[in-house]
Amino acid sequence: AKPRSNWAAAEDDRPLAATGKRQALASSRLFAAWAPSRIISSPWLRCVQTVTPYSVDYGVSVKEKKSLSEAGAQRHPARTARTVASLFDKDSSSLLCTHRPVLPQVMNVLREYLFEGSAEVLPTEDPYLEPGDALVLQVTEGDNPRIVSVERVRAALD
């Protein structure tokens, strides 16, 4: 995203910088390997810009959730937790986009779905992810979904 220090307008309107736009295009090709059939994103512009290339290229609509924005997560952390937990409700591949300040809440929910004794597979401190990074989670199917592996990925820029 454009640096906060260089942005005077509303935070939710802060767009991706040129590098972020290139990363979003490259990530679209990377995400295709997992074929997410649903996209859940913060409604803030830079998150929507991040998932739009995949959405357009593969015909998957974006469901915007205020609870994934920085302001929404700060105001209603329980809603944010429910939104993240909803990823485990269906036996389908999902793509979630949020903001770095929300990642501690996201990681707390993901830890609940780890097999006992495997907490070290998730990032534990800020920065949890660098700009352009993503976590890919492989999850068991069924009534009691569990994360079996976590892979940190970054799309290669052309």
What residue spans do the PLM features occupy?
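A broad structural signal for short, well-ordered beta-strand segments within beta-sheet-rich domains
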Residues: 36, 91, 144-148
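Active-site-proximal alpha-helix that buttresses catalytic centers in soluble enzyme cores
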Residues: 1-75, 81-82, 104, 110, ...
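SAM/dcSAM-binding transferase cores
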Residues: 158
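Short phosphate-coordinating micro-motif centered on Lys-Gly-acidic
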Residues: 133-144
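A short, acidic, amphipathic alpha-helical segment used as a generic capping/interface helix at domain edges
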Residues: 78-92
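Beta-strand elements within well-structured catalytic alpha/beta cores of enzymes
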Residues: 40, 92-106
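Extracellular/periplasmic catalytic domains that process cell-envelope and extracellular macromolecules
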Residues: 88-89, 97, 128
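Active-site lining segments that contact anionic ligands and/or coordinate catalytic metals
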Residues: 91-93, 131-134
